[in-house]
Regions:
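Ligand-binding loop in jelly-roll beta-barrel domains
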Residues: 116-130
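Non-heme Fe(II)/2-oxoglutarate
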Residues: 1-40
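Structured loops at beta-to-helix junctions and adjacent beta-edge loops in soluble globular domains
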Residues: 1, 16, 49-51, 78-80, ...
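Intrinsic disorder/low-complexity detector
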Residues: 5, 18-20, 27-28, 62-66, ...
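Catalytic core of non-heme Fe(II) oxygenases with the double-stranded beta-helix
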Residues: 30-111, 128-130
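Short peripheral tails and domain-boundary helices/loops at the edges of structured domains
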Residues: 129-145
Length: 145
């Protein structure tokens, strides 16, 4: 996946009026993945996330717009995550002093409420590629376990 195009400037948007969706260049480059995600019900937002070696995203809580009766649930699915002995690549949820680690691996998925504080760590030798997707769910259907 190292030959995936990374943003080098403005991204073009394509409107599909039949589906009532807006697509980007990546949807034309990866039509099978686009169809799979669309057929799976992904409608809010989806993208491919690349985190380079030794990089990450510090602790934060996303303020995605959501209606009063909904929650945005974010998913992360490992596409190309080459973990070697002693390396770490994970999504941390909670707080810096009291958090949970969800290891990011090939074909493994994790879902969480995007307003919960979280961070991402990539201590690998290689970039890690993931699908990031958002689902909008009615609050009345979401249980806190």
């Amino acid at each position: 996946m190292s030959n995936l195009p990374e943003s080098k400037g403005p991204e073009y948007l394509y409107t599909n009026t039949d589906l009532k969706l807006v697509f980007t260049d990546n949807c034309h480059i990866m039509p099978k993945l686009t169809k799979l995600l669309y057929d799976s019900g992904v409608r809010r937002r989806v993208g491919i996330s690349v985190t380079h070696p030794g990089r990450g995203i510090g602790w934060h809580a996303d303020q995605d717009p959501e209606r009063m009766d909904e929650m945005v649930i974010r998913g992360i699915i490992g596409l190309d995550v080459r973990v070697e002995e002693g390396e770490q690549c994970y999504l941390g949820l909670g707080t810096p002093n009291n958090g949970l680690k969800f290891h990011i691996r090939d074909n493994k998925s994790s879902f969480f409420y995007s307003r919960v504080p979280h961070h991402v760590v990539n201590e690998l030798k290689y970039p890690r590629y993931c699908i990031i997707l958002d689902h909008s769910l009615p609050k009345k259907t979401v249980r806190n376990k």
